[in-house]
Amino acid sequence: VNFTGFTEKDFETFTIDGLEDRMEAIRERIQPKFKEIGQILTDDLSASLQKEMFLHIAKHARRTINPPKDTWLAIADNKRGYKQHPHFQVGLFDDHLFVWLAYIYELPNKEEMAGNFLENLNTISKLVPDDYYVSLDHTKKDAKPITEIDLKGALERFRDVKKAEFLIGRHIPANDELLRDGEKLLAYIRETFHTLIPLYKMSYH
């Protein structure tokens, strides 16, 4: 793998003004890296889950004026799209890299999935290490450490509020040395996904 990690310049993409210019930088700087690690991570998840997984790279196609504040790759068990399915994500905001298992508001059966999680709250608390984060809105940066969140409350909200979301995983600050070491970073992302696989499976039963 030639993947060398993410640089300061990659994160500076989100300071570029204008939709066209920022999108061009995303396509040139970040998306080639997403393609590279995305395929490795997709193959890895397909093998671990024993089902075919598919790589999606955010196109930001619906945007007409405002440039994206973040960008990501997503891995789901559906070839056409990922937003209506539980999916794994790796992406960048201007100040951190995120590694998520994501359940976003477009999921058609999120009540059922939330119910499965609520029945397994203790298991989830045991499975998920203390350095993990939870986000309730994928468009915002303000994720909280799992140790500081009311998990039951978050999952009930995810179940009951149409727009509510549930993302769980890890954050790496943009200045962290780990991001400059492609091999170590890839191992870290894989380890995070592997930790979250039991939750992914839980959402289907």
Residue ranges with predicted function:
Residues 97-153:
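Compact, glycine/acidic-enriched structural inserts
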Residues 1-98:
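Charge-rich, low-complexity N-terminal segments
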Residues 72, 131, 165:
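A residue-level signal for beta-strand positions that form part of recognition/binding surfaces
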Residues 79-115, 163-167, 171-175, 180:
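Intrinsically disordered, low-complexity regulatory segments enriched in Ser/Thr/Pro
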Residues 76, 86, 120, 192-195, ...:
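Short, hydrophobic/aromatic alpha-helical segments in well-folded domains
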Residues 1-46, 140-205:
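Long, solvent-exposed, polar/charged low-complexity segments
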Residues 64, 91, 124-126, 157-159:
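A general structural signal for short secondary-structure junctions and capping/turn motifs
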